[in-house]
């Protein structure tokens, strides 16, 4: 993220709006597994819902987080053309996105189901004009750049998109065709006959595409756009953006065929022809955070790398603590080795959204109090510790200490929380280790790696879509089997000394970090308490484990 010039939040795809997708296991090579933090040969699932985006406010928080990590990068939000998209786009603009991409139904996602490609979505023209009109009427048009895609192939398409309000244009399928794609729509099968979309080394040798071919394509398209602009009497593309008055609906040759009224697409929300659209050249500022003060206070750490400990009182309006600091740590030390706990922030109070989001190795956040949603989102090597206020009389194992969607997409690092987590805990965790004392519904969904230890009850739908990693649950009520999918997961008691030692080590670490009385009770009575734990593992990775779940060689049926 630190090196990006633009970051795109893909809310949906034009070719299959509202649908997810998957990468079949036979396409998950060693290289892809490394990049995706997953297991070789195990199917990767891309779910339809965004578990961290349930409202415009959630999207605004994600944009805010990304701008803390890299304030120089543009943030683009991809929306699918649909009825009522103007209202959504207005919210996205208010959320301080820099670019809004309107995607049409003609997109060339070759792995999409044919029913979706043929019948789902609407043309980008309908979505683009509505968005341009709504943003203009609400005084938001100058705050964002409008971009469109979905079957744009020629200079005429580009010119029409510009007249309808677009300032930028994506040409994906057309570029692939220039590189050799012949549109056989076998992208999901690993059998692309021209080597464009396959991991098969023999087929990849057939790939004949070069950068020059794409340059030639774009040169011809640009020339066609120039000719159209000249015919209209203008000299620059910027001069025709939003000029729908230069468009008109043409007849299809007969009155009974002209039953489609496109006048709504040709309405100019701003009638003043002198209004200029292409004027959003900067990047929307996300505002200041506590991290800016922390960075100033940590000047000696950045100068000498010496171990540093800082103390702050926080409130729930202090959002994204540690993210901008993590960006500075990465840019300062890069790939040089930095020890754990090299800089520690001791926080007291209620931390706001996204505590420790993207936190890197070397950074430790210790909170005495509680935290809101998104704790440890995309955790990247850092450590987060939460425990109740030392004067609190509540029992940690019976109370919630952090909100929803915590450890979402974490790749490495640690989270220890003396209390319950909310819903959607550790979704898409792919390498981090975390110990909490209970969680809500949809825990460990789509998880591909790492370790999750729940010292308490879980909600329903635990481990749905989980294809990697290991989970341990303290099954007090003996009803965990009703909250998990038996078809995809193996769940059983601890039947291996190796995994028992792993579990006990994690709980010991949890106690050492949080002083949890609940964890201490389990450790002190280990011989009787270990039998209450359930170990959960995806069936797909059973042959890839460092140690088998059961020590003896005889197969035992999972409980």
Question: Model-derived features: where do they sit?
Answer:
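Alpha/beta enzyme core
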Residues: 1-149, 154-183, 190-198, 237, ...
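Generic structural marker for isolated residues within well-ordered, non-membrane alpha-helices
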Residues: 63, 225, 530
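Alpha-helix capping/termination and helix-coil
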Residues: 70, 132-135, 139, 225, ...
């Amino acid at each position: 993220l630190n090196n990006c010039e633009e970051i795109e939040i893909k809310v949906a795809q034009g070719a299959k709006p509202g649908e997810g997708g998957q990468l079949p296991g036979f396409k998950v090579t060693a290289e892809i597994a490394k990049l995706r933090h997953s297991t070789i040969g195990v199917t990767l699932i891309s779910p339809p819902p965004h578990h961290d985006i349930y409202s415009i406010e959630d999207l605004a928080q994600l944009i805010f987080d990304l701008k803390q990590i890299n304030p120089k990068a543009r943030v683009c939000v991809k929306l699918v053309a649909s009825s009522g998209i103007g209202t959504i786009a207005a919210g996205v603009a208010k959320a301080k996105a820099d670019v809004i991409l309107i995607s049409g139904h003609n997109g060339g996602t070759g792995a999409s189901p044919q029913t979706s490609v043929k019948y789902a979505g609407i043309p980008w023209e309908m979505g683009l004009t509505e968005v341009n009109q709504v943003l203009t009427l609400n005084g938001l048009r100058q705050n964002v750049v409008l971009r469109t895609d979905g079957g744009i192939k020629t200079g005429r398409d580009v010119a029409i998109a510009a007249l309808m309000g677009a300032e930028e244009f994506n040409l994906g399928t057309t570029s692939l065709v220039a590189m050799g794609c012949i549109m056989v729509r076998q992208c999901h099968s690993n059998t692309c006959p021209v080597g464009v979309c396959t991991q098969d080394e023999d087929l990849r040798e057939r790939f004949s595409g070069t950068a020059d071919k794409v340059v030639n394509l774009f040169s011809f398209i640009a020339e066609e756009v120039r000719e159209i602009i000249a015919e209209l009497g203008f000299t620059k593309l910027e001069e025709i953006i939003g000029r729908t008055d230069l468009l008109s609906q043409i007849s299809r040759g007969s009155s009974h065929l002209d039953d489609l009224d496109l006048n709504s697409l040709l309405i100019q929300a701003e009638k003043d022809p002198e209004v200029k659209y292409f004027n959003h050249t900067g990047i929307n500022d996300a505002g200041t955070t506590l991290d800016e003060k922390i960075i100033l206070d940590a000047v000696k750490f950045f100068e000498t790398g010496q171990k540093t400990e800082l103390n702050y009182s926080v409130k729930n309006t202090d959002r994204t603590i540690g993210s901008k600091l993590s960006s500075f740590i990465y840019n300062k030390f890069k790939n040089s080795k930095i020890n754990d706990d090299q800089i520690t922030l001791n926080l007291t109070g209620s931390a706001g959204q996204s505590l420790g989001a993207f936190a890197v190795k070397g950074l430790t956040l210790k909170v005495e109090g509680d935290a809101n949603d998104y704790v440890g989102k995309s955790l990247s090597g850092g450590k987060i510790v939460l425990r109740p206020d030392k004067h609190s009389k509540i029992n940690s194992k019976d109370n919630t200490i952090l909100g929803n969607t915590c450890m979402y997409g974490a790749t490495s690092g640690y989270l220890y929380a003396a209390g319950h987590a909310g819903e959607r805990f550790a979704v898409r965790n792919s390498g981090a280790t975390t110990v909490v004392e209970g969680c809500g519904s949809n825990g460990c969904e789509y998880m591909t790696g790492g370790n999750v230890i729940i010292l308490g009850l879980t909600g329903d739908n635990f481990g749905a879509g989980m294809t990697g990693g290991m989970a341990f649950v303290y099954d007090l009520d003996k009803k965990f089997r009703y909250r998990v999918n038996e078809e995809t997961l193996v769940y059983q008691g601890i039947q291996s000394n190796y995994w028992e030692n792993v579990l006990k080590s994690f709980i010991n670490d949890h106690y050492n970090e949080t002083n949890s009385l609940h964890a201490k009770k389990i450790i002190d009575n280990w011989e009787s308490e270990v039998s209450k734990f359930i170990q959960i593992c995806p069936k797909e990775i059973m042959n890839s484990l460092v140690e088998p779940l059961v020590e003896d060689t005889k197969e035992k049926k999972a409980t």
